[in-house]
């Protein structure tokens, strides 16, 4: 697949604040410190789980839930705060809450998509809050079939990467067309994760259903990235 096919919103990189995909790669990262101690913020990092000493930071969780009732979207948009509805543009109410800072897409069928949360727990909490808002507007909404659909994370390996060499040697998994998209797209088979690798050393990982897939994918790719570390002039 050509690099042009990568849409940041499809990957779940868009957040509730409408940030562009490129803004995702600036997240924090845990790295090995002196004496072998590894810290992420104030939290120690388990080297058995993260041998690289780098912990990808979750940036966006996309989840879905079934409210299990038909909804009058026009009524919801008129009565709810922080809600907008323009059926000519998009067939869903767009609703936002501040805590957790998220955006929901609410469809007339009762299906809902929640995006923008930074953890699985916050995604579920936000989805429950949206469901309660709909209930308070008079709809018999329930909370069925909650599911994490995509986890997006980012990290920084702190060294530049020779993307041309990586693309050549890993052509079966890689797509790199810098005139169309600045990053190399690496489609890992196991776990089935898509990685966006940038020359700066910034990495975006997407396509996971559970966070351990993110961690496993990064530990798989990290030794490969070190092979293509660009020598500093």
Swiss-Prot record:
Disulfide bonds: none annotated. One of its GO terms (biological process) is DNA-templated transcription initiation. One of its GO terms (molecular function) is RNA polymerase II general transcription initiation factor activity. InterPro entries: TBP, TBP_CS, TBP_dom_sf, TBP_eukaryotic. It comes from the Eukaryota. It is found in: Nucleus. Gene3D superfamilies: TATA-Binding Protein. One of its GO terms (cellular component) is nucleus. Belongs to the TFIID complex together with the TBP-associated factors (TAFs). Binds DNA as monomer. This is TATA-box-binding protein 1. It comes from Triticum aestivum. The lineage of its organism: Eukaryota, Viridiplantae, Streptophyta, Embryophyta, Tracheophyta. The gene is TBP1.
């Amino acid at each position: 697949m050509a690099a042009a096919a990568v849409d940041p919103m499809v990957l779940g990189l868009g957040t509730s604040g409408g940030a562009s995909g490129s803004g995702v790669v600036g997240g924090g990262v845990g790295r090995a410190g002196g004496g072998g101690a590894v810290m992420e913020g104030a939290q120690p990092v388990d080297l058995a789980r993260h041998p690289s000493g780098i912990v990808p930071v979750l940036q966006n969780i996309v989840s879905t839930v079934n409210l299990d009732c038909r909804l009058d979207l026009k009524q919801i948009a008129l009565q709810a705060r922080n809600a907008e509805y323009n059926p000519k543009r998009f067939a869903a109410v767009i609703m936002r809450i501040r805590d957790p800072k998220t955006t929901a897409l609410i469809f007339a069928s009762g299906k809902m998509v929640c995006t923008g949360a930074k953890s699985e727990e916050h995604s579920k909490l936000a989805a429950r809050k949206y469901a309660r808002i709909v209930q308070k507007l008079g709809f018999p909404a329930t909370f069925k079939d909650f599911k994490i659909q995509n986890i997006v994370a980012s990290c920084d390996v702190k060294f530049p990467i020779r993307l041309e060499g990586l693309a050549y040697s890993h052509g079966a998994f890689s797509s790199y067309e810098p005139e169309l998209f600045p990053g190399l797209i690496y489609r890992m088979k196991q776990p089935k994760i898509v990685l966006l690798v940038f020359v700066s050393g910034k990495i975006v990982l997407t396509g996971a259903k559970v966070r351990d897939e993110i961690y496993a994918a990064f530990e798989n790719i990290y030794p490969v990235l070190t092979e293509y570390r660009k020598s500093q002039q």
